[in-house]
């Protein structure tokens, strides 16, 4: 089995369905004999450029271990899900379980917002 990192950009109006979508994709991975090593919800973030006249998207990152049949099934599911604006799959040499630099940035922003609300 190979290790992959998947980043999904979800339509911002579908943010409520993100947990259900994530569970469905994780179910597909585990049903095919794969493992989810890391899942990160980066939240709604500004896009670098407009996609389908949208300036923001909900970001998800998954680090998984799966075979090629499961990956083909996932790619097929991403393509035919209208809520998925873009997806990127990168093959990795080993499983990443530590928080990504993007997740550290998200946590830092949340801590800053929390301290601002406490001061107010």
From Swiss-Prot:
Recorded hits in HAMAP family, A to Z, give:
Ribosomal_bS6
- Could you name the domain of life of the organism this protein comes from? Bacteria
- PANTHER family membership: MITOCHONDRIAL 28S RIBOSOMAL PROTEIN S6, SMALL RIBOSOMAL SUBUNIT PROTEIN BS6M
Q: Which GO terms describe its cellular component?
A: cytosolic small ribosomal subunit
Q: Where is the composition biased (Basic and acidic residues)?
A: 105-120
Q: Which UniProt keywords apply?
A: Ribonucleoprotein, Ribosomal protein, RNA-binding, rRNA-binding
Q: Name one GO biological process term.
A: translation
* Stated name of the protein: Small ribosomal subunit protein bS6
Per the UniProt record, one Pfam family is: Ribosomal_S6
Which intervals of the chain are annotated as region Disordered? 93-120
Function summary: Binds together with bS18 to 16S ribosomal RNA.
Q: Which family does it belong to?
A: Belongs to the bacterial ribosomal protein bS6 family.
| InterPro entries for the chain | Ribosomal_bS6, Ribosomal_bS6_CS, Ribosomal_bS6_sf, Ribosomal_S6_plastid/chlpt, Transl_elong_EF1B/ribsomal_bS6
Q: Which GO terms describe its molecular function?
A: small ribosomal subunit rRNA binding; structural constituent of ribosome
Where would you find the membrane-spanning parts of this chain? none
